[in-house]
Amino acid sequence: MSRLFLPVLAIVLVSIGASHTASLEWPSNLVALSSVKSSQLLPIASEDSVELADGSSGSVSSSAAQPEDQSQEEAEEQQVSSASSGSADPISGRLVSAGIPVSVPLPLILAARNGLRTVLTIQEPAVAKVGEVVQHVPTAVSHQTQTVVHDHRRLVTPIVAPAVRTTQVIRQQPPLLWSVASDPRVVLIRN
């Protein structure tokens, strides 16, 4: 019986020791998120609290510094991943006010819903201002400088294609009402 008891005791002690070391390495806010019973996030140890803990005991400061370093690395990785994935949050946070002129390669396709699009054929050497009333003018369209604006995210995506000049006005809906989220005034794009 003692032969069976000793290996089981060793396995239990090793697993308890591993669980204690693993819980010390996790940032405190992630530990609070993983437990179902806790409803509040625990604050991550700041530099002041680490310095205070350093004065009292060296082991506490070394264990508190590791979660802080890991949480900083995780925050940097999240920033890099959100920048590479192209999320809309940083774009929506930088909305342009109506008074500032913005240089936009023209023409624009403003898509309010899927399948509804309006090609604005504006004379190409032009600067479009946000909040400006724009008209449909049948002039030459250069597909090389065509820019697609996704209305739901305000993303500007350049399209590179062979330079073929055509004259076209594509309208699949009545005149489009368009407003910018930061400026509640409605802009009418009329014929």
Swiss-Prot record:
The keyword Chaperone belongs to this UniProt entry's keyword annotation: no
Organ and tissue specificity: Specifically expressed in cornea (at protein level). Detected in retina and cortex.
Pfam families in the record: Retinin_C (PF04527)
Phenotype caused by lack of the gene: RNAi-mediated knockdown has no visible phenotype.
UniProt entry keywords in alphabetical sequence: Phosphoprotein, Secreted, Signal
Region (Disordered) residue spans: 52-88
Modifications the protein undergoes after translation, according to the UniProt entry: Phosphorylated.
Cellular component per GO, a single term: extracellular space
Entries under InterPro entries matching the protein: Retinin_C
Signal peptide positions (record): 1-21
Compartments where located: Secreted
Entry keyword Transmembrane: no
GO MF annotations in UniProt: structural constituent of eye lens
Biased composition (Low complexity): 55-69, 78-88
Name by which UniProt lists this protein: Retinin
